[in-house]
């Protein structure tokens, strides 16, 4: 049995669920045709990365039903069966909200060109959002693809068309069904999250134990309301894209070199404040000072904030950069130096 560092684990918020402080993001694994060109399709390579992460102690995997039209979830399930991973030793986070379609990118583009929001689209009726019907259908399908239960089911976004009572009752019921152990949320306004939590509290239903929000050195708007609220109420923070879609891993001049930086639709839509270049320069400077990669430095900042960041690993060799972040202890002076150039930016990540 391998020796795993206690430093790599912690409870998710006030819950008793222990997760690895680094969470393996599985959006990168699936099919290019169903998602984007930077997705890793080779199953054996995907399993090699997952096994290396698992052996190193990263035993919490984050996926979603919509990633590559469900292929990402299928790969997580196949990995568990291929290596006969004890189910009790791994934590699976998945999500529901978006449609699960092989033509998802195309249909979103078509609807956008017609000025129709996907939640209002007749073609996607009951295939997205947070209605009781869709939540139940999504959980049934995810459990089939995974071949097992979901440890934390996260609502991918807030649905303004469905009442808080309907959403939280449905989530409570899927937990009571045994197909889901806990519930979490992702990317919404703080007042929306509070409304949902208060509704669950009022009725004695299961509440969210985690918030998966967009938070990194280039985007810190969540520090105004959402993060303080979560910290105050014991909700665990598991930020997605702690490396800002890879932008925090390379110097400014190198940021147009990867397939992802050239083709990722979300990356191209990002907006950065006036301090963007200064922040990247300081990340690069401190990375050299500590003799680590920029990815390690940026991930260490996230860990310092008390977050359990979701890390995307596209090659086994990159795993060491993520693990090194757990060992790297930044000083308060380092943190201040990294954060100082930040300037406010528009709210991002919402639908």
Curated annotation (Swiss-Prot):
Sequence positions bearing Phosphoserine: 113
GO molecular function, one term: oxidoreductase activity
Enzyme Commission identifier(s): 1.1.1.-
GO cellular component: cytosol; nucleus
Pfam families for the chain: Aldo_ket_red (PF00248)
Classification via InterPro entries: AKR_Detox_Biosynth, NADP_OxRdtase_dom, NADP_OxRdtase_dom_sf
Cytoplasm found in the keyword field: yes
Transmembrane domains' residue ranges: none
Keyword vocabulary terms for this entry: Cytoplasm, Nucleus, Oxidoreductase, Phosphoprotein
One GO biological process term: potassium ion transmembrane transport
Location of this chain's protein in the cell: Cytoplasm; Nucleus
Highest taxon of the lineage: Eukaryota
Main location: cytoplasm
Family: Belongs to the aldo/keto reductase family. Aldo/keto reductase 2 subfamily.
Protein name listed in UniProt: Putative aryl-alcohol dehydrogenase C977.14c
Organism of this sequence: Schizosaccharomyces pombe (strain 972 / ATCC 24843)
């Amino acid at each position: 049995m391998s020796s795993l560092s206690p430093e790599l684990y912690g409870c998710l918020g006030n819950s008793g669920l222990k997760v690895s402080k680094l969470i393996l993001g599985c959006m990168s694994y699936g099919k290019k045709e169903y998602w984007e060109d930077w997705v890793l399709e080779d199953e054996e390579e995907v399993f090699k990365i997952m096994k290396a992460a698992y052996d190193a102690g990263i035993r919490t995997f984050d996926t979603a039903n919509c990633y590559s039209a469900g292929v990402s979830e299928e790969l997580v399930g196949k990995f568990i069966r291929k290596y006969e991973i004890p189910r009790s030793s791994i934590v699976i986070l998945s999500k529901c909200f978006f449609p699960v379609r092989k033509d998802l990118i195309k249909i979103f583009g078509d609807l956008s060109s017609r000025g129709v929001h996907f939640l209002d689209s007749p073609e996607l009726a009951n295939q997205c959002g947070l209605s009781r019907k869709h939540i139940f259908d999504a959980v049934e399908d995810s459990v089939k693809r995974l071949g097992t239960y979901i440890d934390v089911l996260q609502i991918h976004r807030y649905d303004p068309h469905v009442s808080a009572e309907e959403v939280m009752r449905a989530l409570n019921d899927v937990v009571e069904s045994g197909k889901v152990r806990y519930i979490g949320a992702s990317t919404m306004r703080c007042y929306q999250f509070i409304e949902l939590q208060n509704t669950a509290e009022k009725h004695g239903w299961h509440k969210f134990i985690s918030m998966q929000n967009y938070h990194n050195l280039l985007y810190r708007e969540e520090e105004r309301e959402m993060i303080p609220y979560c910290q105050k109420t014991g909700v665990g923070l598991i930020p997605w894209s702690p490396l800002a879609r890879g932008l925090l891993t390379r110097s400014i001049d190198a940021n147009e070199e990867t397939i992802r930086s050239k083709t990722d639709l979300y990356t191209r839509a990002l907006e950065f404040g006036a301090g963007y270049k200064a922040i990247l320069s300081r990340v690069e400077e401190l990375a050299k000072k500590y003799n680590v990669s920029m990815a390690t430095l940026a991930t260490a900042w996230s860990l310092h904030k008390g977050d359990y960041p979701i890390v995307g690993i596209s090659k086994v060799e990159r795993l060491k950069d993520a693990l090194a972040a757990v060992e790297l202890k930044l000083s308060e002076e380092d943190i201040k130096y990294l954060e100082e150039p930040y300037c406010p930016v528009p709210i991002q990540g919402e639908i």
